[in-house]
Amino acid sequence: MARTEGDSWDLANSVGATATMVAAARAAATRRSRPIIADPFAEPLVRAVGLDLFTRAASGEVDLDEVAAGLGFARMVDTFAARALFFDKFFADAIAAGLRQVVIVASGLDARPYRLPWPTGMRVYEIDQPEVIEFKTTTLARLGASPTADHHPVGIDLRDDWPSALRAAGFDAARPTAWLAEGVLIGFLPPEAETRLLDNVIELSAVGSRLAADYGTINGSSAESQQLAQQMTEGWRAHGLDMDIAGLTYPGEHTDVAAYLRSHGWETATADHGDVVLAAGLAELTAADRQSPASTIGFVTAVRSTD
């Protein structure tokens, strides 16, 4: 089903199911003999969502890489583990630079407010659909998990007036902020909503603020991309999952986030999928690996150095 303005979802359906898939990949990565990330909350969160394939993948009963490779997505676990590590390092660098305010947009099943070793005085805000925020905070509370920072979840759709909701939750725009947009600017918002999101981030960012994001689209307009999207949709359906890749993303030209930030005076550094995998200490991507949807995604870290 195609996306519509104002549509909603939970973690078992539509865009929400992709967040559960990513968490299952983090759980699988955590189980490896030499893991590059440790996310002890990924498996119980996936289990609580209740999608059978991802539950079994998170627990190690099913090889998620094997399943995904059959759908045209090579090295899925490496992809999402390396992405998580890339953004974890972004936060470590922000902390070292003295930043003590974080905003995670479209946080999904991201458990960074609980799993990262935040310093004293760190305020962490996370924004997502109200149902997603409620599910995650309730599930983690039942597990006995406590945030490792001063945690402020904000339940609101990014297509709504989230800046006002963020301020109402205590966000201080006068303080430098580390912003994370992981897995959201890759086609899951309409192009105009992407630039609106970035404009809001820029407006709310004091000098010294930082942003990290992945960007592009997982569903290109070429015949090859459309064929791969159809292959993945049919494959997920065969596993009992309704994840129509073409239907989950918005058509149109999506935002070059790095270029947009540079045009607004931010200093940027970019990387591609292969760079991020190599930086994580994993094997270099082969030509076949580069045919996966992740190969089209770029990464940026940026700093606002002037008004």
Swiss-Prot record:
**Record EC number:** 2.1.1.-
InterPro entries given in the database record: Ppm1/Ppm2/Tcmp (IPR007213), SAM-dependent_MTases_sf (IPR029063), SAM_mthyl_Trfase_ML2640-like (IPR011610)
| Keyword hit for Transferase | yes
What the entry lists under Pfam families is as follows:
LCM (PF04072)
**SUPFAM superfamilies, alphabetically?**
S-adenosyl-L-methionine-dependent methyltransferases
Q: Which GO terms describe its biological process?
A: methylation
- List ligand-binding residues for S-adenosyl-L-methionine: 128, 157-158
Keywords per UniProt:
Methyltransferase, S-adenosyl-L-methionine, Transferase
Citing just one GO molecular function, the answer is: methyltransferase activity
Per the entry, what this protein does is: Exhibits S-adenosyl-L-methionine-dependent methyltransferase activity.
Q: Which family does it belong to?
A: Belongs to the UPF0677 family.
Task: Please state what the protein is called.
Answer: Putative S-adenosyl-L-methionine-dependent methyltransferase MMAR_4570
Q: What is the lineage of its organism?
A: Bacteria, Bacillati, Actinomycetota, Actinomycetes, Mycobacteriales
